[in-house]
């Protein structure tokens, strides 16, 4: 089949438009039918650009009784009645919320639209009073339970994350507004809310005591995103075209897609998921790139990382944590981990059932190297746009055996770091080296120590294996001696490549590399 005849839903987030234009669709309607059959309120947390808006739009089409839009899909064989319900769809994603007035204005915009259909009582009443009246009138006028769909419920909260007064004001407004859903329960047929994160403690949903949070529940794990099976069954012609353009085999193309965009796990027991945004853009552009990451790191996450003193190396190597450590965000702790996880930069890699501990790590290469490049400007004078170029220079010098140029470039790297970015702590030096070697890992086999008993860094090129040991205010010979005494070279003795030891000392006063020796 000519792939030009197959339409990719690039930029389309409404189910009706996607189906009307004949776009490709990964069929999730069986699980949608299962959820819609119940009457408890649902909440789903997923990263941005992961299909939440399309999911909500699909629920909207289903509850509007739009049987014509579901022809050929799994739900067509499951649903027999196709009843029509009044649907109130609130999307908070489209606006920037700088003041409480902005939030109230957005709520009023939707309330006025609904009042035009179901009538109003008094316009000067509070948003929650008007919302309550609309739900009651929608029920009385149609004789059907009301469906309430809220997309990106937390957008205002995320934009006020580090402004406690504004955050409290948004919470107060939304808590009162969403609280109507409890008092109006007898008029409601179905509730589904989505967002990036779940806020703990003073939750805007505290009145919805029956809220079913399906974010980490196994039966719902694949409701957003694309499994490998779905990728191959839905997009085989696109994969074949991509393989042709990239001059790769079909199998290698799927493997490359898997390394770049797969790996999201929202429970400890399910298939990995591909990021749908990146998948569609790869097929559209016919080249591998960091599509999701290039859409920008959310401002709230940037601000949170700036304010926290979190050792970011923990994220790079993976870390163990209980579910309470990442499932809910607590604003008062300033711990960025839950927000990093829920924003899609970390995912579940493993689960120890005996200890109830999760291992979190980067889901794939797109996120891993995108995040490393994002961190570089916080520790060095290099912009994220320049990181690829600089990493390649470091790699080429080691590939050619020019350790001297490599170390001199590293010296220049440190010398250019502004005073306010630099500290005399060993951790700061370690993080910078850590980031450099990790970024080199895109091009060569580069390992950085994450545990005792290993060299600080090992880089393997075609002809050589380099072992680096770093000392703060130490002696270069001590670093070299440690390489020998700890046996860091032993695993590579029979490798056949040239083995190179590099001892490095830091001068904390000068905030730079003091000496280095190559053996």
Label the model's feature ranges.
Residues 1-425, 440:
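Phosphate-binding site recognition
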Residues 147, 464-466, 500:
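Structural motif
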Residues 168-172, 472-489:
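Mg2+/Mn2+-dependent nuclease catalytic core
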Residues 433, 457-472, 486:
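Conserved catalytic cores of phosphodiester-cleaving nucleases, focusing on short active-site segments
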Residues 436-450:
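A short acidic/basic microdomain associated with nuclease active sites
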Residues 451-455, 497:
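Short beta-strand or tight-loop elements
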Residues 491, 495-519:
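Domain-level recognition of nuclease-like catalytic cores that cleave nucleotide substrates
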């Amino acid at each position: 089949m000519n792939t030009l005849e197959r339409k990719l839903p690039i930029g389309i987030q409404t189910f009706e438009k996607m189906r009307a234009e004949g776009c490709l669709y990964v069929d999730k309607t069986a699980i949608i039918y299962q959820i819609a059959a119940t009457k408890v309120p649902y909440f789903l947390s997923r990263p941005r650009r992961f299909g939440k808006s399309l999911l909500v739009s699909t629920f909207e089409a289903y509850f509007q009784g739009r049987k014509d839009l579901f022809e050929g899909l799994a739900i067509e064989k499951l649903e027999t009645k196709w009843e029509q319900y009044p649907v109130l769809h609130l999307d908070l994603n489209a606006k920037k919320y700088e003041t409480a007035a902005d939030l109230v204005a957005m709520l009023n915009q939707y309330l006025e639209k609904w009042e035009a259909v179901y009538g109003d009582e008094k316009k000067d009443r509070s948003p929650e009073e008007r919302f309550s009246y609309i739900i009651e009138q929608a029920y009385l006028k149609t004789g059907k339970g009301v469906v309430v769909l809220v997309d990106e419920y937390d957008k205002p909260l995320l934009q006020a994350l580090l402004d406690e007064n504004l955050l409290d004001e948004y919470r107060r407004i939304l808590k009162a507004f969403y609280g109507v859903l409890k008092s109006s329960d007898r008029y409601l047929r179905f509730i589904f809310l989505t967002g990036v994160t779940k806020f703990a403690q003073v939750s805007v949903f505290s009145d919805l005591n029956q809220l079913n949070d399906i974010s980490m529940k196994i039966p719902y794990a694949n409701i957003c995103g694309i499994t490998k099976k779905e990728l191959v069954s839905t997009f085989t012609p696109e994969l074949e075209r991509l393989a042709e353009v990239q001059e790769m085999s079909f199998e290698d193309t799927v493997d490359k897609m898997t390394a770049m965009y797969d790996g999201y796990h929202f429970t400890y027991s399910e298939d990995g998921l591909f990021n749908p945004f990146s998948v569609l853009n790869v097929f559209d552009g016919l080249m591998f790139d960091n599509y999701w990451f290039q859409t920008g790191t959310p401002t709230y996450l940037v601000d949170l990382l700036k304010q926290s003193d979190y050792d970011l190396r923990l994220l790079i190597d993976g870390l163990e944590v209980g579910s309470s450590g990442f499932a809910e965000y607590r604003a008062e702790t300033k711990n960025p981990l839950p927000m990093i996880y829920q924003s899609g930069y970390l995912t579940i890699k493993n689960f120890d059932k005996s200890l109830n501990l999760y291992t979190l790590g980067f889901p794939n290469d797109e996120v891993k190297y995108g995040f490393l490049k994002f961190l570089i400007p916080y520790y060095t004078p290099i912009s994220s746009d320049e990181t690829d170029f600089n990493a390649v220079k470091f790699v080429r010098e080691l590939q050619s055996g020019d350790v001297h140029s490599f170390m001199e470039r590293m010296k220049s790297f440190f010398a250019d770091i502004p005073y306010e970015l630099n500290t005399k702590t060993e951790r700061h030096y370690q993080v910078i080296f850590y980031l450099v070697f990790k970024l080199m890992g895109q091009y060569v086999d580069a390992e950085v120590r994450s545990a005792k008993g290993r060299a600080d860094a090992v880089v393997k090129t075609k002809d050589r294996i380099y072992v680096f040991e770093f000392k703060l205010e130490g002696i270069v010979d001590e670093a070299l001696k440690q390489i020998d005494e700890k046996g860091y070279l032993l695993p590579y003795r029979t490798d056949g490549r040239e083995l190179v030891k590099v001892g490095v000392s830091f001068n904390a006063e000068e905030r730079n590399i003091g000496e280095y020796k190559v053996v």
